[in-house]
Amino acid sequence: MVSIPSICPLCGGEVERLVGPVEWDLRGELVVVDGVEHGMCAVCGESFFDPEVADRLHRFAVVKLKRARGLLPGSEIKALRESLGLSQAAFERLIGAGPKTVVRWENDSVFQNKTADTLLRVLRDYPVVAADLMAKTLG
């Protein structure tokens, strides 16, 4: 944890190194993730994370939130796209998503909304619908 300071840059307090649960904010929703290596200021309570730990923590929190909401995980979204033989860009055109949306869903850096999740499930569960939409959208 080289990048975690020993002195808090906010208040000057001592930063304690800990391994334990942390709350991670995902769009205003707090997700508790256990066993996280981090630093916490003994005076003001500010938390500090190594950048690599923060990235893993964020992805883990997204996966946990997807599971809690009953959303498809990134691995299933990728499997669906690949089963249709589409690139990420072509899949985005098919479903009307913005650039780089699918890669973010697939690597669990963001979660899809319920409407998008429902569309993904329809494409997965009804191949005829997927084929018809592909013919109309992608030519």
Regions from the PLM with identified roles:
Residues 2-71, 122, 126-139:
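N-terminal flexible/basic segments that precede or flank functional cores
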Residues 51-115:
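Extended interfacial segments that mediate partner engagement and assembly in macromolecular machines
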Residues 97-139:
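A generic hydrophobic-segment detector
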